[in-house]
């Protein structure tokens, strides 16, 4: 269904047919290439921002174009055009294939539709509500947050939606298309008491229409729940004391704290870093790289999730990839280029920000599978340490695996009980060492609410993260107490 719909909107509307794509791929193959592809994209994006009870910003953007890639060995020729036409395709193909002078046979495998499971709706979220209905969601969030506590001074809420159509045709016979909706709601609040100010934030989204935000979440409208959560987090930090410093046990909460796993481990398991030998995990397949309690997967096949892809941006169907199993490194996330050069199989992780960018190995939804311990058992096992259920930003060095992460919500654990909230706690360590220090894995796997944005080499993409509650026996905590 996607292929027919997208072909009509991206190709037929611009006077193109599948035969034209086959002919352009044939032009690429007139040089001695290992692979060539055409990537068509049309995206519609809107965003709205409410601040101080006023709609302060609204934007709408349409972008479409085509990227043409030619690969020979490790060399890549790439050209793109911000219009979709036969002339633009021909000129881009001419430019992309100039990396190779040797003649090829001009043969291309017959294009065949790639079969894949529908993982999300093909409804255009931008058309799923009127403008006033969208703005009413923001006004609702503002009202709920302010009514939640009189100490709330400022509320900022933003709503964004994307409707994206993509089509891929390649010299290996790939012909695939996808329709990708994506929505996100974010809320940030500022609370003040006795001259002391703190912020809290919440939100979420996924591959839905905007009605998702008005649906039920545990007996409450989802948008309302997130507004109250932002207020709760801000109030927690209002009463927080300075975090202790030193090496101690750290309990990481379920869900969004999986961002540490994403950064400190996930990036190091992307194929390009490992082919170049620049990852701490290079050459470690089959080796014990984590506690035997740890199984980590990257799963592009989750229904409606922010990071999911029915097909990746090279036309490979999204897959469920086991990266680490019982502590043993099983494999890397691959795109077509790095898979071919490493003698491996593409894993559905070839992703790109747009037609104007080259694809590379990227994560989809990366998470750790649940274990057998209850969260309560994990907390009770700690005499003195930190419980971190929410994270802020972080940085990681792919080569060494070293990371620094700041917590946005954290508590002291004393004598097996969560006691007072702390602020200013940063977690410092290295990916492999931290994974090997995991001594308990919870039975409460949770994925994030759908807010993840991953950056790599200047390209931003939607991703998902998750994990159960985890106990790390020894982690360096940077604090101010």
Curated annotation (Swiss-Prot):
NCBIfam families with a match to the protein in the record: PRK10735.1
GO biological process terms on file: protein processing
Top-rank EC class of the record's enzyme: hydrolase
Record EC number: 3.4.-.-
The organism's place on the tree of life at top rank: Bacteria
Highest classification ranks of the organism: Bacteria, Pseudomonadati, Pseudomonadota, Gammaproteobacteria, Enterobacterales
GO molecular-function terms, A-Z: iron ion binding; metallopeptidase activity; zinc ion binding
InterPro entries: Metalloprtase-TldD/E_C, Metalloprtase-TldD/E_cen_dom, Metalloprtase-TldD/E_N, Peptidase_U62_metallo, TldD, TldD/PmbA_N, TldD/PmbA_sf
One GO cellular component term: cytosol
Protease is among the record's keywords: yes
Further information: In strains containing the pMccB17 plasmid, required for the maturation and secretion of the antibiotic bacteriocin microcin B17 (MccB17).
PANTHER family, sorted: METALLOPROTEASE TLDD, UNCHARACTERIZED PROTEIN TLDD AND PMBA
Family stated for the protein in its record: Belongs to the peptidase U62 family.
Name of the molecule in the record: Metalloprotease TldD
């Amino acid at each position: 269904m996607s292929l027919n719909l997208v072909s009509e909107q991206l190709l037929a509307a611009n006077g193109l047919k599948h035969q034209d794509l086959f002919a352009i791929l044939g032009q690429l193959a007139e040089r001695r290439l290992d692979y060539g592809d055409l990537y068509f994209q049309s995206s519609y994006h809107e965003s709205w921002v409410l601040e101080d009870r006023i709609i302060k910003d609204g934007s709408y953007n349409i972008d479409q174009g085509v990227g043409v890639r030619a690969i020979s060995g490790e060399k890549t020729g790439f050209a793109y055009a911000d219009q979709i036409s036969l002339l633009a395709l021909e000129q881009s193909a001419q430019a992309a294939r100039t990396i190779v002078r040797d003649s090829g046979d001009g043969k291309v495998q017959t294009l065949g539709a790639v079969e894949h499971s529908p993982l999300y709706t093909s409804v255009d979220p931008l058309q799923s509500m009127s403008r006033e209905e969208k703005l009413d969601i923001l006004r609702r969030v503002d009202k709920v947050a302010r009514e939640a506590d009189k100490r709330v001074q400022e509320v900022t809420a933003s709503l964004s939606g994307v409707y994206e159509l993509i089509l891929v045709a390649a010299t290996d016979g790939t012909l695939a298309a996808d329709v990708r909706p994506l929505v996100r709601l974010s809320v940030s609040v500022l609370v003040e008491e006795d001259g002391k100010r703190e912020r809290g934030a919440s939100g979420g989204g996924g591959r839905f229409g905007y009605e998702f935000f008005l649906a039920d979440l545990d007996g409450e409208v989802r948008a309302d729940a997130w507004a109250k959560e932002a207020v709760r987090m801000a109030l927690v930090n209002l009463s927080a004391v300075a975090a202790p410093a030193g090496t101690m046990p750290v309990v990481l909460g379920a869900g969004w704290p999986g961002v540490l796993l994403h950064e400190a481990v996930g990036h190091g398991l992307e194929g390009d870093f490992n082919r170049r030998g620049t990852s701490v995990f290079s050459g470690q397949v089959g080796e014990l790289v984590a506690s035997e309690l740890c199984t980590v997967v990257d799963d592009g096949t989750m229904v409606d999730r922010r990071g999911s892809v029915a097909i990746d941006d090279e036309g490979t169907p999204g897959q469920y990839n086991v990266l680490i199993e019982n502590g043993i490194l099983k494999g890397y996330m691959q795109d077509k280029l790095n898979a071919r050069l490493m003698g491996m199989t593409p894993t559905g992780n070839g992703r790109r920000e747009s037609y104007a960018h080259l694809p590379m190995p990227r994560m989809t939804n990366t998470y750790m599978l649940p274990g057998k311990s209850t969260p309560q058992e994990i907390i009770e096992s700690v005499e003195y340490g930190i419980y971190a259920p929410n994270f802020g930003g972080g940085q990681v060095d792919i080569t060494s695996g070293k990371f620094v992460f700041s917590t946005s919500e954290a508590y002291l654990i004393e004598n097996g009980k969560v006691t007072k909230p702390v602020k200013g706690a940063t977690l410092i360590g290295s990916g492999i060492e931290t994974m090997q220090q995991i001594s308990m894995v919870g039975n409460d796997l949770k994925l994030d609410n759908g807010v993840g944005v991953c950056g790599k080499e200047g390209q931003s993409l939607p991703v998902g993260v998750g994990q159960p509650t985890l106990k790390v026996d020894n982690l360096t905590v940077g604090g101010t107490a």
